[in-house]
Amino acid sequence: MYKNQLQELAQRSCFSLPSYTCTREGPDHAPRFKASVNFNGEIFESPTYCSTLRQAEHSAAEVALSALSSKGPSKSLTARVLDETGIYKNLLQETAHRAGLDLPVYTSVRSGPGHIPTFSCTVELAGMSFNGESAKTKKQAEKNAAIAAWFSLRKMPRLDPLRGEEKEQEIVARVLSRFRPKEVKRREPNQSRRRTVIRTIRQNTTTTTTTTGDLLCEKLRSINLYTNEASSSSPPPQRFWPSRTNLTQEQSKVKSLLEKCQEYAEKKQSLDDPKPEMRIKTSSPSPLSSSVERNCYSKLLPFPSFVLNHQKLAPAVHIRSVIPVCSAPPPKPNPNPNSSPFITRELGNGSQEKKSLPN
């Protein structure tokens, strides 16, 4: 844990990474370790011996972090890490914006030889300038200037004592608010009044919404109970049917249409049939008329309509006995069965010849 913090601090401060050296003492079955760390040219040793090498390195890193934190303006370890990572630049900018002032302006000056430059930075805020410690990089010089400005503003006379980091930011914002222009000071009470009015309105709306919500829930519950009781006791709703006068008028129209359709179907059937005497008359209505009737009534009554593919009645079929030409005529029956079975054939001379038929 301490090794990671020390390494992160070195990376963000643009320093070389810390290097560890360890010494071992004691027998092989019970060794003891003591470590030292080199951080930016300074060496820090662990105060006591440890049973493992890792513990010795962590103790050396802890000593280094505590020593570095005591050198800075803040005394805690976490505050020192924040100082080196540039958090105070963000805090200074945020508090200046909150106080209604212009953002801080940093001016850095480079000095020293080209291969080993040094930078010194000054920050201007609310008509005041603050100088920071010189550093090897421009970024670090700006961080140092922000730290110097922050702690100098915090040391200005105040009414209440310091109570943690959150209270510290409020104190700096209050100090900076003294240097605001008069126009911004006049706008502040109006804004505070608007904020208080908005808060009261929101509170009232929340209370009214809660009360109205409770009333609505109670009403909905009562309505649900009433509807359940009514649905269990009341009969089912009646369907809407058209009046009788409309039904009679529509029925008369449908009948006239059916008669016309039937006449048209009879005329068409008479034209299609080859022989009118073979027409088959039935008392049942034609399929066309039935389909028309159903389609007409379907507009009035709520029953589904069915469409069927009806076909016409086939004409009557006459069966005739056909005799082929090539076949011999049928034998005629003999009127005299007692006569002799002879066949007479006339010859060309006028004489007749008789032949007996075979039995």
Swiss-Prot record:
Free-text disruption phenotype from the record: No visible phenotype.
Residue intervals of the DRBM domain: 1-70, 87-155
Key words, A-Z: Repeat, RNA-binding
Pro residues bias spans: 328-338
Record-level Gene Ontology MF annotations: double-stranded RNA binding
PROSITE patterns found in the cross-reference section: DS_RBD
Pfam families noted in UniProt: dsrm
Compositionally biased region (Basic and acidic residues): 266-280
CDD domains: DSRM_AtDRB-like_rpt1, DSRM_AtDRB-like_rpt2
Region (Disordered): 266-292, 328-359
Superkingdom of this protein's organism: Eukaryota
Function: Binds double-stranded RNA.
Name this polypeptide is given: Double-stranded RNA-binding protein 3
